[in-house]
Amino acid sequence: MRLDAITLEHFRNYAHESVTFDPSVNVIVGENAQGKTNLLEAAVYLSCAKSPRARTEKEMISFDADAARLTGSVFSRGRDFTVEIELSRGKRRKMSVNQVPCKRAGDLSGVLNTVYFCPDDLLLIRDGAAARRRFMDLSLSQLRPRYDAALSEYNRLYDHKTRILRDAEEHPSLLDALPDFNLRMAQCGAVLIYYRARFCKLLADYAASAHRECSGGREELTLA
């Protein structure tokens, strides 16, 4: 599995840029604020339609543009893939793999897997639970399509429930729908908790082994 090339149009500070990667190791160098991290972000976004940095899609669209397009040429599972994602202000994003439209981000699972590490990852330890959930969401969405589907549905229900509570003062009858929303959110939440617990268990085993090797067996790392 490898990313052979990437083309960006109006993504972050890239008006139009195409980059071809070597099949082995690639080192990206440049001055500050030249777009090195933006390029890595684009690669991650092509893998799972989730950004490790942006909280909203419009943050990734250039200030002077209405839409952004990302295209990745990927070799995976013995064949070539072209992954395309289009982001638009005020419109739903469009995704496709080999020109076949994707209905949800989980449809990208398994085409390109990425591992993103940056200095901000120290927030996993120093910051609150939100940073750790974001890390797990980004990782699990690439590995388990069912997790990504449950996460998308949970967020949709959460947003809808928030609107109900906001408008209930003027329309009290909206509150009648809350029990159904609570049940469906609990069902999606159970799926998320199940996968997160399994992920933490596997990560704890690998992390303990790696730390044991780094410390010469003098220290034992545990995750909880």
Residue ranges of model-derived segments:
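An accessory alpha-helical subdomain
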Residues: 120-217
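Conserved P-loop NTPase catalytic core
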Residues: 223-224
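Phosphate-binding site recognition
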Residues: 15-16, 20-21, 44, 53-61, ...
